[in-house]
Structure formats: C-alpha cells, structure tokens
C-alpha cells in the first residue's frame, strides 16, 4: 500500500469539511463545500488554497544566475531583487521538464517553485546540471504555501499585514513580511486568473495562518478551496497544467507560453535550437480553445477530428462554472487552429460537434 504524502495542513481539513483524494501521491482536499461554490467565491469574493504540496528549491552562489540561464527558457538576467518570473525548463529536444516560478531574493539567492508531481525529477535535473559556484537545495518539506485569491483577497490579507499590500505589484514580492506575526514571503501571483497573493511560510506556521485568514476573511465571504476549484479556475484562465498542457512531449511554444521563452538571450539553454525554430517559424501543433456545440464534456485525451483525420486531442475540459459552457483546451495540428474551425470530439465513442474559440476563456476586468 502506497503511503500518501500530506501537507502540514492535513489535520485542519476535516474541521472545514475537506474531502481528500490522491493527487499525484498527495492526500489533498478536492473540495470543502462544493467545486462550484468555491469557484464562484474566488471569482466574486475570495478563496484560500493550501498549495503546500508544491516544491521549493533554493539556488544560491556566485554562479547562480549563469546556472539558471542555462537551465530555464526565460531571461533571468532581467529579474530584479523582489521580482518573480514565470519560466520553463526544457529537454534538449524542446519538450518540457516543468514550468515554474523564480523569485529573486538577493543577487545570488533565488527561490524556484516547482510542480508537486515533479519535485524529485526537477531537483535531480537541476542538481545534475549545476555549474561553477552554484548550490541547489530542495527545501520543499520546510516550506508551506497558501494562496489567497479573488477580488477581495487584498483587503482580507491587509487586515493581518502592516505593510501596504498595494505596493506589491503583479509578479513582485516582499520577503520577511509579518502575516499575523508569522514571517513569510508574500507575492502577488496566483493560478486562478484573479488578483491575489501566494504566501510562503515555515511548515509549522501554516495551520495557524490558515485559521487566522479564514477567521478575518469570513465576513467578506472568504472560503477554503480545494483542488477541484483550483483546476476549473486555472482552466478558464487558460493557465497550463503540467501533465496535460505541458509534458516531455509538448514544448512551451506549442502550449502557448512562448512569452516565457527567450531564444535571443546569450546563454545556450537546453532546447534552445528547437524553441528558437518554433518561435520564429511556428510549431507543428497549437493549444487552442474548443467549445462543444452538442451535448457532452470534453475530457483529457479525448481525440479531436476533422472528417476522418485525427488532428489532436483534448488536454483539459469541463463545464465552465463561469461561462456555463462545455469547453476544452486541445493540442491540435496548427493548420486547423484558426478560430471558428469546426471540429469533432470523440466523447464515449460518439463524435460530437465543436468549434475552435479564442482563449483565454475568462479574463478578469481590471
């Protein structure tokens, strides 16, 4: 029997009605009240997520920048202390090792935040390519992460923070902020398509912080949220999920995150030749939005057809809680990727009519 890993908040889930599932070897809450209710709370008020299963790796040393420039696709040299950057790590063939966030805490001090299912693989990949005076340390077990997301997130978090949160702009952070007396790194980032913050603290402080935030946010409608709503929210915002929109067989260009690939940076990073070619001349496949016109919900790996030709497959799909439509993301042959192209999705051995639509499906009004 496989023992599932648990976050420092596991013992608190039951108090709030959390229903747990096995998520990539982690016992995590899929929902507390209902996915629809939690999704709605984040779009209209605020939601609190336990994201402590995510991995954290510290990269330090004189050669830390040179090392990161070699292993990630974005240009880390443009990052200033107090800034965050979204990027990817790729194999030499351009396939994706992982997508991640890099926080620059000091001139020779970076924190990498990686996907939970990839912690060991990513750490080994990084450690095996270290150059010069750079150190790579996996600190995942020492760090917990909470995400407070939604239009009311700032107001709620402000109640327990003395610094003015308005000063933390999008993709910026402050280190060593006291959140209700607990030292934390607070960044204006998220995975929902809404405004919000991700809070990194010591594992032993996570439960106290979780309870305090839910207490001070209750009157504004802050709800504890699970993986179900996290997935429907990120999907509507067209934010990729590793293992679905990204994988060792899918490049960042194909997945629509070409903005995080800088082939013109000086460093010869892994996958550079392939990604440069795809960025300049186009990739053979493209991630597109699809709306199902007939009955049926597109799910991961469902094949997409035009006539008898299979042109790709669905990577993610659901009945969108915000749009009340059956929509999906699909990786398809680029020659059929134009908006309004009519396609068919095979749902339970039956072909269902669908159409290519623009993405993101949802974009918050500023």
Swiss-Prot record:
User: What is the enzyme's class at the highest EC level?
Assistant: transferase
What Gene Ontology terms for biological process does this UniProt record contain?
glycine decarboxylation via glycine cleavage system
User: Any idea which GO molecular function terms this record carries?
Assistant: aminomethyltransferase activity; transaminase activity
What this protein catalyses is: N(6)-[(R)-S(8)-aminomethyldihydrolipoyl]-L-lysyl-[protein] + (6S)-5,6,7,8-tetrahydrofolate = N(6)-[(R)-dihydrolipoyl]-L-lysyl-[protein] + (6R)-5,10-methylene-5,6,7,8-tetrahydrofolate + NH4(+)
> Keywords in UniProt for this one?
Aminotransferase, Transferase
Which Pfam families does its entry note? GCV_T, GCV_T_C
Task: Tell me its EC number(s), please.
Answer: 2.1.2.10
SUPFAM superfamilies given in the database record: Aminomethyltransferase beta-barrel domain, Folate-binding domain
Instruction: Specify the superkingdom.
Output: Bacteria
Name the GO cellular-component terms.
Answer: cytosol; glycine cleavage complex
Q: Does the keyword Transferase apply?
A: yes
Checking InterPro entries in the record gives: GCS_T, GCS_T_bac, GCST_C, GCV_T_N, GcvT/YgfZ/DmdA, GcvT/YgfZ_C, TrmE/GcvT_dom1
Q: What does this protein do?
A: The glycine cleavage system catalyzes the degradation of glycine.
PANTHER family, per the entry: AMINOMETHYLTRANSFERASE, AMINOMETHYLTRANSFERASE, MITOCHONDRIAL
Quaternary state and interactors: The glycine cleavage system is composed of four proteins: P, T, L and H.
HAMAP family according to UniProt: GcvT (MF_00259)
The family line of this record is:
Belongs to the GcvT family.
What protein name does the entry list? Aminomethyltransferase
**Which gene is transcribed and translated to give this protein?**
gcvT
